[in-house]
Amino acid sequence: MQDVDYITPNETEAGLLSGIDVHDLESAKRAAEAIHNKGVKNTVITLGSKGSLAFDGKKFIHSPAFPAVVKNTAGAGDAFNGALASGLAKGKSLESALCYASAFASLAVETSNASDMPEHESVIHRIQSIHYQQTIFTH
């Protein structure tokens, strides 16, 4: 997996890539580190209702999920990944892009149709209306 800048597996995929059963934050950290050691620069493991965990080789960033009234989880991972990629492409820091992606995905699961994606203004409102705190662990 040399030359991969970002990979965004879910818990199951991270387990397959790393050989580590991912079931909590600590096992996600071990899996992210193992994937990084295979040459991936940035690993972002999506953890469903537990949020996401990123590792860039120097620090881990745990971004909790935003509270949501879940109607349909179909497309939640795609919504998260699209918002993350958009934020990174716009030059946002990984921390900022993760926050935006988490808020975006929380709004996406509140619709009954997986193709209904939230508007930017709704995402910003969600971010501003909730005390959101990421946890950063140094390696």
Predicted regions: what they are:
Residues 1-30:
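Conserved beta-alpha-beta core of the PfkB/ribokinase-like small-molecule kinase fold
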Residues 25-139:
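Conserved phosphate-binding/catalytic region of the ribokinase-like
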